């Protein structure tokens, strides 16, 4: 079972590398944007889609400061 999980992760990583290289090689801005959108859609954490990643880090740092 663990072998299947490892293979699945390796396939996802290789797919990401292919998308990134395709975005870098593409000369058309449309192709670059679509490839970047795919990378963002599939390989970034969910908070990145909502734009809350920065807010979370700010809130957590404020909570840490308030706790002290």
Curated annotation (Swiss-Prot):
Q: Give the UniProt tissue specificity note.
A: Expressed by the skin glands.
Q: Which residues form the signal peptide?
A: 1-15
Residue positions where Cysteine amide is found in the record? 53
Query: Where is this chain's protein located in or outside the cell?
Result: Secreted
Keywords for this entry? Amidation, Amphibian defense peptide, Cleavage on pair of basic residues, Disulfide bond, Secreted, Signal
Chain positions listed as propeptide in the UniProt record: 16-41, 57-68
Disulfide bridge positions per record = 47-53
Say which domain of life the source belongs to: Eukaryota
| BP GO terms, sorted | defense response
Q: Which GO terms describe its cellular component?
A: extracellular region
Protein name listed in UniProt: Riparin-1.5 amide
- Species name for this entry? Crinia riparia (Streambank froglet)
């Amino acid at each position: 079972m663990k072998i299947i999980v490892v293979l699945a992760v390796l396939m996802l990583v290789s797919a990401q590398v292919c998308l990134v290289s395709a975005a870098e090689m593409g000369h058309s801005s449309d192709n670059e944007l679509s490839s970047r959108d795919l990378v963002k859609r599939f390989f970034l954490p969910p908070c990145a889609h909502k734009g809350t990643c920065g807010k979370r880090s700010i809130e957590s740092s404020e909570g840490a400061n308030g706790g002290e």
